[in-house]
Amino acid sequence: MAPVMRLGSAALRSSIHLTSRQTAFTAARCYSSKTQTLKERFAELLPENIEKIKALRKEHGSKVVDKVTLDQVYGGARGIKCLVWEGSVLDAEEGIRFRGKTIPECQELLPKAPGGKEPLPEGLFWLLLTGEVPSEQQVRDLSAEWAARSDVPKFIEELIDRCPSDLHPMAQLSLAVTALEHTSSFARAYAKGINKKEYWGYTFEDSMDLIAKLPTIAARIYQNVFKGGKVAAVQKDKDYSFNFANQLGFGDNKDFVELLRLYLTIHTDHEGGNVSAHTTHLVGSALSSPFLSVAAGLNGLAGPLHGLANQEVLNWLTEMKKVIGDDLSDEAITKYLWDTLNAGRVVPGYGHAVLRKTDPRYSAQRKFAQEHLPEDPMFQLVSQVYKIAPKVLTEHGKTKNPYPNVDAHSGVLLQHYGLTEANYYTVLFGVSRAIGVLPQLIIDRAVGAPIERPKSYSTDKWIEICKKL
């Protein structure tokens, strides 16, 4: 990481200068102007966080923090400790922590919609960016700001409408997000020549705009490809998840809205080394705008080894249901699991690159299902697989983690409420993941993170190096 800089008061004032969009929003909002905005709070915390990094590097900058084996080099850099990611840390035994807080703690502490039980993703965005749990008022304000920024440019609507209906929804989402580069305040400011200390303020503006517009873009893709209907207007007094659910056509189903709040919250962030998070960071390190950076991350998320896993789980469960019918006995499930493994296939939704216990994101979804759809046949099947699969996988002996991950459950929940188009599920994931990766992109620009540039060698060079060791 490049040396970080101290931001003076003038730079901070410049970074939080209101754009015309913000000015209009501030004038229109009906809540107290005394409430500190997210941008103001981040700016206030920034000097202390910069000093923390400077002190860490000054005292420990020359220390060796990891050892790398050749297997790791050839194994996808698995487990190499070389990235800075402030929002979350993944522990193999207890799962993800968002700014030090577990998923159950986030479910308890983060503000909720009136009458709701699940946390609002707006609150998690605030937590990821600042490290602080926001107040209910701060979350309401953030909901209102995202709603105020949600209008999608006409040329983006026309671009989506002209896509072939059989073009994969993720390709359409990436296309639309890339095209939003045309609206980038960061790109315009950079082209004019701005001080590096101002980068983060423009990155923040683009990030807020992108997050605000994603549900409407995603819903337009859904309506065009699957429903042929119109996208409902954003209701300015409603939260982010309600508006997304309503634009998808599920706004009247309170349980689905609650599910979407949970889904968007728990899929946001999972450390910085996964493909979508790392790609966003990598592209952003070249000073590409948040639009181009997130579009690149979405392309990574679209890969079958990353964001398509819940589709594979759902397909596998559907195949199992056809074979075993209503027989959910231990014997029937065990036989099907062994048939899958003996055929050289994996059990989708089980195992994880880091985790060695049940994914707490799975547990959160299971708890939701137990409360809202305990009699659903597919949930009952998922529950039986959860009961039996770890034992079978352990006996099989070829996995380090025989427990379910987040993908083992989400498809069944979405199917229950009528969102049955499995090849759209990654779009939901993408909307959520943007909320998780953009806080780090803002932080990167605020602390002066450099362009990423690791060293590479050919196999012949590695042979030469290893012979000398």
Swiss-Prot record:
Disulfide bonds: none annotated. Signal peptide: none annotated. It catalyses: oxaloacetate + acetyl-CoA + H2O = citrate + CoA + H(+). The keyword Mitochondrion applies. Keywords: Mitochondrion, Transferase, Transit peptide, Tricarboxylic acid cycle. GO terms for cellular component: mitochondrial matrix. The active site is at H352. Pathway: Carbohydrate metabolism; tricarboxylic acid cycle; isocitrate from oxaloacetate: step 1/2. It is found in: Mitochondrion matrix. It comes from the Eukaryota. InterPro entries: Citrate_synth-like_lrg_a-sub, Citrate_synth-like_sm_a-sub, Citrate_synthase, Citrate_synthase_AS, Citrate_synthase_euk, Citrate_synthase_sf. Residues 1-33 form a transit peptide. Its EC number is 2.3.3.16. GO terms for biological process: carbohydrate metabolic process; citrate metabolic process; tricarboxylic acid cycle. Gene3D superfamilies: Citrate Synthase, domain 1, Cytochrome P450-Terp, domain 2. Belongs to the citrate synthase family. Citrate synthase is found in nearly all cells capable of oxidative metabolism. PANTHER family: CITRATE SYNTHASE, CITRATE SYNTHASE, MITOCHONDRIAL. This is Citrate synthase, mitochondrial. It comes from Neurospora crassa (strain ATCC 24698 / 74-OR23-1A / CBS 708.71 / DSM 1257 / FGSC 987).
